[in-house]
A protein has these predicted regions:
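Short, charged interaction patches at domain edges and termini
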Residues: 1-9, 46-54, 97-141
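Small/polar-rich, solvent-exposed N-terminal microdomains that initiate assembly or binding
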Residues: 1-51, 85-101
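Alpha-helix initiation and capping sites
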Residues: 35, 53-55, 72
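Short, solvent-exposed beta-strand edge segments and adjacent coil->beta transition regions
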Residues: 56-60
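Short beta-strand-to-loop capping motifs
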Residues: 61-67, 132-134
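Extracellular/virion structural assembly segments
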Residues: 65-94
Length: 141
């Protein structure tokens, strides 16, 4: 669910609207290898390390745009945002979708921009990747 929290942070930062141009838990690259026709930013996470109650997830923000210039500028702004403003984040919230929160958050610098797939018209799905460490809060007490 850390991917939903990052998605909500993107919405708060003005990168789009959840469910319209911001998505989590789905990929713009389909199982057939083809590319989704829905444009926007897709946020996904995968656990890369667990040390006691400290979790580290790899976050991927994939971009799918019709306009290559808009995509390039968005990726540039995202790199800056993650490496500057977002890195100072101490907690993340999944609100208003869920009441789940993540405290004691540490955001690591981006690892770069990758090309994940290409559609039938030569447009790329580009992604940035970075790690986020966090502690789980006891929500089921």
């Amino acid at each position: 669910m850390i991917d939903l929290a990052v998605c909500m942070a993107l919405q708060e930062a003005g990168y789009g609207v959840y469910g319209d141009t911001l998505f989590f838990g789905v990929s713009p690259v389909l199982d057939s290898g083809s590319v989704s026709s829905t444009f926007g930013l897709y946020v996904n996470s995968q656990t890369v390390d667990v040390q006691g109650d400290l979790y580290t997830d790899g976050i991927t923000i994939s971009s799918r745009y019709d306009d290559v210039l808009e995509q390039g500028l968005t990726m540039y702004k995202l790199l800056w945002w993650v490496n500057n403003d977002f890195r100072s984040t101490c907690s993340l919230s999944c609100e208003p979708i869920s009441t789940l929160r993540f405290d004691h958050v540490r955001v690591y610098p981006c690892k770069g921009v990758d090309f994940d797939a290409i559609d039938g018209q030569g447009r790329w799905v580009k992604s940035i990747r970075f790690d986020v460490s966090y502690k789980l809060l006891p929500i089921f007490d």
